[in-house]
């Protein structure tokens, strides 16, 4: 088998990172070797994101650069994958004729066959979405070295979304919701844990709706995301379990109970609210209210008092008034999030919000975002200061010069000084003595 080299550049979310890992393993299994040198690679694959216009612009700019690389290295194949590929399809090759292959989000498992075809047939676009798509079984390689030095992994449990929020392209770029079987997921995680992985994060566009659209059990009995969590938590050797992301409308009492029942489930919940105004939420198509959201926050904290709640915020949605933005600021003050990801609204082609005419001025959006982020930083610092004087279990990520960098179960980063014989991937206790906006400082507790 002829050996070829490949280079993957990943844009966007954790789903894309996991997809890139899957693509890399498939390529490795078919004789490819990964390289860090993009210019000399036989294959350059851009795994793209279209959640905001800026991400698309970065991809097109990189494709322009690759035109020059391909002139120097005519053997190079260029592949565009991910959400930009799904959204733009043949338009990519019309604008960038040096692109050999455009594959949508349901075609990553066929990457090798499509590359072979493009070498003989010329440019190929594979982006048709199938409503009856089934995610193929995927078990990671386990020769013993694949995960050397790694201790944290993402595992995709479902793909697509059926919510059709008016600002979001995901249902159009990832297709309808489809869930992997519990058996496949547990088998993948078991293999990863046996190879040394300590922490697993389950991924889906809306994990709360896992198993709502297709059967995930061998005997076709109904199942829920909570059922999956309980089975994954039982995998021997798994130390920490997380998941992302969730839609509040599907958050069940049983899922909240899992934070009481499952020791490995980290006390962290990313619960996107997007806006603090019922009018804006309705325009966004979010299907919950401010009141129902706040009730969920209360219940989560009752079930798990130490839980750290984070969120997503969009400012400047079409028609958002000053008064409605103030309601979002009130939401921030009420919940006092440990952290948030906040963005200015960005028009996305094909979405309902894109057709709205009452757009908010860019300068107003910028001012609102700056104000929200400044207050979030203040609250984040105040939240972090609550940990001063406590002793926390930390999973070591880095170790250098008498200091460790690690992460708590709440996902807070901790820098702790002191001597230890432990290495990255091990756990230790750290006494927190100081707090910043985005991390904590402390000292290693001697055993």
Curated annotation (Swiss-Prot):
UniProt domain TRAM: residue ranges: 385-446
Catalytic class of the enzyme: transferase
Entry keywords, A to Z: 4Fe-4S, Cytoplasm, Iron, Iron-sulfur, Metal-binding, S-adenosyl-L-methionine, Transferase, tRNA processing
Cofactor note: Binds 2 [4Fe-4S] clusters. One cluster is coordinated with 3 cysteines and an exchangeable S-adenosyl-L-methionine.
Radical SAM core domain sequence ranges: 147-382
Tagged with keyword Metal-binding: yes
PROSITE patterns (alphabetical): MTTASE_N, MTTASE_RADICAL, RADICAL_SAM, TRAM
Catalytic activity: N(6)-dimethylallyladenosine(37) in tRNA + (sulfur carrier)-SH + AH2 + 2 S-adenosyl-L-methionine = 2-methylsulfanyl-N(6)-dimethylallyladenosine(37) in tRNA + (sulfur carrier)-H + 5'-deoxyadenosine + L-methionine + A + S-adenosyl-L-homocysteine + 2 H(+)
UniProt KW 4Fe-4S keyword: yes
Location of the MTTase N-terminal domain: 4-120
Recorded family membership: Belongs to the methylthiotransferase family. MiaB subfamily.
The protein's name: tRNA-2-methylthio-N(6)-dimethylallyladenosine synthase
